[in-house]
């Protein structure tokens, strides 16, 4: 079994990417998608089942419902478990996650948000907003999401490389996650190119024009 953990400062981006990743992984083997935190966009929304599911993840952890009860079958290759409907209903423990990942016969498990300390063997991804590149992250990999059409990743080369983690690329507004998922699954990491001398000179000249003309 291979486990993926997807984290982000923006809930809707995380849920959408987690769903897209699970949909891709199911082509290679049976996949379980698990959400641990409820937000304005949830995994069940992407499958058209909002308000149609009785049990959630906390019900399983508190023994209110069995694994089969909380597990929603999307198709023969993909099942999912929704986040607790009531926030702070249950504090997730390492023992909870260990028990959960032993359930069923899954080749892949995708967590839509999870504390990385709760599971040992995993591949983790952090989704970064265009103008909010952090100084550091705990996750293995990261990518920039929702960048504008005029975004030039080369201008952010120093910040990206200073994070010291694997960079999967950037996603422009309105584009899908196919390229990022390809890079993630194939361990293809993006090396941000340098600006050429003439490009730097041109940018300085443009800045000078803006200031003095």
Regions found by a protein language model. Name each.
Residues 1-3, 55-61, 65, 92-95, ...:
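Acidic-aromatic/histidine active-site loop/patch
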Residues 3-5, 31-33, 80, 124, ...:
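Conserved beta-strand scaffold positions in the cores of enzyme catalytic domains, especially
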Residues 7-10, 36-105:
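P-loop/Walker-type NTP enzyme "switch/lid" segment
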Residues 29-30, 77, 123, 141:
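Residues at the starts of beta-strands that form the adenosine-phosphate
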């Amino acid at each position: 079994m291979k486990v993926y953990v997807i984290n982000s400062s923006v809930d809707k981006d995380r849920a959408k990417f987690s769903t897209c990743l699970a949909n891709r992984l199911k082509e290679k083997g049976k996949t379980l998608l698990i959400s641990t935190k409820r937000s304005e966009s949830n995994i069940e929304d992407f499958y058209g089942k909002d308000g149609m599911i009785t049990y959630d993840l906390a019900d399983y952890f508190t023994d209110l419902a069995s694994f089969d009860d909380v597990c929603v079958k999307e198709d023969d290759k993909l099942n999912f478990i929704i986040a607790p409907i009531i926030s702070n209903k249950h504090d997730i423990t390492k023992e909870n996650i260990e028990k959960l990942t032993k359930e069923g016969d899954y080749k892949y498990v995708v967590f839509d948000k999870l504390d990385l300390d709760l599971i040992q063997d995993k591949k983790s991804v952090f989704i970064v907003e265009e103008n909010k590149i952090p100084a550091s992250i705990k996750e293995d990999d990261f990518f920039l999401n929702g960048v504008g059409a005029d975004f030039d990743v080369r201008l952010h080369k120093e910040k990206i490389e200073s994070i010291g983690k694997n960079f999967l690329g950037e996603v422009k507004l309105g584009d899908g996650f196919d390229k990022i998922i390809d890079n993630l699954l194939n361990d293809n990491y993006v090396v941000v190119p340098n600006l050429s001398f003439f490009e730097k000179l041109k940018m300085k000249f443009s800045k000078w024009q803006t200031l003095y003309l």
